[in-house]
């Protein structure tokens, strides 16, 4: 029968005898309050004893304490020092975290080459997280030349190792035929496997497939259920997608609520949707300045739809002074950018391009 108090008793005896793993386990108990009263000072003491004795797991845990400020003042440099030692001992999670620190410049000067080195070391040693990160770097050309063959290889290895993010990203590549021949059966399979592990991005992607009838029979009710589950886990894009379908169904107040929640989660398309509501006075009072602010926020997040709307606002003087010549130039630039954008599959995208074309034509004379 499980008994944390007995476990702590034996870990304590092992630690007193100099067993490094017992020290690390005892420290974990003190940190989490398992079988003993929580005591961060005691946890830090035993992590340090174990780490100084050469235990890679304790080195990782000590680094994590410095990173989080558990029992000690937060210190990223100390965290990196212990992650480095743990990584050199072959501890996989230390490799993961050290690579992350180099990638994002946390506690150490940003260095993509070193980040990639440790991701590769971790991946080759069996870390599914490092495999996923390596796949992501190859897919996006971060720190290495873009190579979709390598991306697929590492995503597949990570997904087969149980990494839900890799399952989703691999599914997305099969879904869109990027770096691999489009295969909706495989896409749906990977999305479903990731969703089973509560991956919100995969739930959202499944929702999109059901909404569009892509790889599965079109079923809006099932799509909305997947969106709902994803949104409950914090997936902002799922709230946006729910908002879109509610808007199409004429449930405008509900749509606005989901758009607002998605915008609060930094979904760029949600800012476009909110801007439209304010521009046209849908559910809310018509407010050109607020519409323009929404479009500006979405544009900063990368939304081409917001860029098109913002250019149109400047041309027509919505929410600010009208600037016909400069506005026309911005509209033409936005339209050219829109033609090449990866957002083309987004809801409402073609309608936005057509609106901008009409606006340009009406104001060129």
Describe every region a protein language model picked out.
Residues 340-365:
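Terminal, low-structured helical/coil segments at or just beyond the last alpha-helical repeat
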Residues 3, 16-19, 32-34, 39, ...:
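Short helix-capping/linker turns of helical repeat alpha-solenoids
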